[in-house]
């Protein structure tokens, strides 16, 4: 039995030094809903956000299923190899709403080609892009 109703759901795993603080950010600032939350800040939390999940957990050393991998928060938040990208219908409205809730954007939304975008950081320094496609409604990339 699985908690996933579809064949596949894309989730994003976030390593946090303070799971409770991150849970509050992803629920109270970004508007997600905690669907699984541990009793203590050291336990995993799942936040439903848009049509996906954010999995928040503390870092840690290798385990038997990832024997060479150590999970940690970004040592330098300005050097990034991967980040969460949230697509929205109205970036100006999201920018205003999330700013009012305490999100600290790096810049206001800016036009870049066929999208407007801006960036925020979560409490552990992980980068999050917020973007709005400015292509015609219903446009999809070719398959």
Where are these regions (language model features)?
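Short, solvent-exposed loop/helix junctions and linker helices
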Residues: 16, 85-88
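Conserved beta-strand-loop-alpha-helix junction that forms the acyl-donor binding cleft
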Residues: 13-19
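Short glycine-/small-residue motifs
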Residues: 127-130
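Conserved active-site tyrosine of GNAT-family acetyltransferases
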Residues: 22-27, 98, 125
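Short Gly/charged-rich anion-binding patches and loops
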Residues: 21-22, 93
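Vicinal oxygen chelate
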Residues: 1-11, 33-86, 93-121, 133-143
């Amino acid at each position: 039995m699985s908690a996933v109703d579809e064949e596949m759901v894309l989730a994003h795993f976030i390593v946090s030094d303070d799971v409770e603080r991150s849970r509050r950010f992803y629920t109270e600032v970004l508007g997600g809903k905690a669907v699984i939350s541990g009793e203590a800040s050291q336990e995993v939390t799942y936040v439903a956000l848009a049509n996906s999940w954010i999995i928040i957990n503390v870092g840690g050393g290798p385990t038997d299923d990832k024997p060479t991998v150590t999970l940690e928060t970004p040592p330098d938040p300005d050097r990034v190899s991967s980040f969460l990208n949230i697509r929205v219908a109205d970036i100006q409205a999201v920018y205003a709403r999330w700013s009012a809730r305490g999100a600290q954007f790096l810049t206001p939304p800016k036009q870049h080609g066929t999208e407007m975008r801006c960036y925020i950081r979560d409490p552990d320094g992980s980068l999050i892009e917020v973007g709005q496609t400015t292509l015609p409604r219903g446009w999809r990339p070719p398959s």
